[in-house]
């Protein structure tokens, strides 16, 4: 019998950053040129991250579920989709592609509240939109209920706008 000894040699290619750092350690390096190379590398990383963000956002939009109008506005007798319908339609896709949503109150007065929604991606890219909404003082709501009603309404509309969502019956242009 012949005994065969196997060895595995793996070629490890240096990353761009490792090559730049090794060059920086050379005593005859042109620091201005090195800075320009680092700037170019940073620009390329940002471009790739933006591409990944747009690619994942496009995939998320294809993963949306239908939004059903599940409630009736007692004042206008019209149907609408509640906030939970919007969230249910997008949450699985957002989780799959590691997106996160954030809301924050940017400004509040006795009459209005400004809300911002941000969609964040692991690449560091974000998109945001905001709106100013009148505090809903209709009916017999106390001030906390009025604000809560307005925030729910604002979150639904901003989520729809940011993620290009529409309930089935709202989408009248196909």
Regions found by a protein language model. Name each.
Residues 1-174:
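Polyanion-binding surfaces on beta-sheet-dominated domains and ring/shell assemblies
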């Amino acid at each position: 019998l012949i005994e065969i000894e196997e060895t595995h040699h793996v070629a490890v290619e240096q990353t761009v950053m490792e090559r730049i750092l090794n060059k920086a350690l050379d005593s005859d390096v042109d620091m201005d040129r090195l800075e320009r190379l680092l700037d170019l590398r940073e620009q390329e990383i940002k471009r790739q991250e933006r591409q990944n963000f747009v690619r994942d956002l496009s995939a998320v939009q294809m993963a949306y579920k239908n939004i059903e109008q599940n409630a009736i506005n007692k004042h206008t007798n019209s149907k609408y989709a509640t906030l939970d319908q919007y969230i249910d339609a997008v949450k699985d896709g957002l989780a799959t592609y590691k997106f996160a949503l954030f809301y924050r109150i940017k400004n509040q007065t006795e009459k209005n509240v400004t809300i911002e929604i941000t969609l964040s991606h692991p690449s560091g890219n974000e998109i945001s939109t905001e709106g100013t909404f009148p505090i809903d003082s209709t009916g017999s709501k106390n001030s906390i209920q009025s604000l809560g009603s307005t925030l729910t309404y604002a979150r639904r509309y901003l989520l729809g706008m940011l993620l290009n969502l529409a309930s089935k019956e709202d989408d009248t242009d196909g």
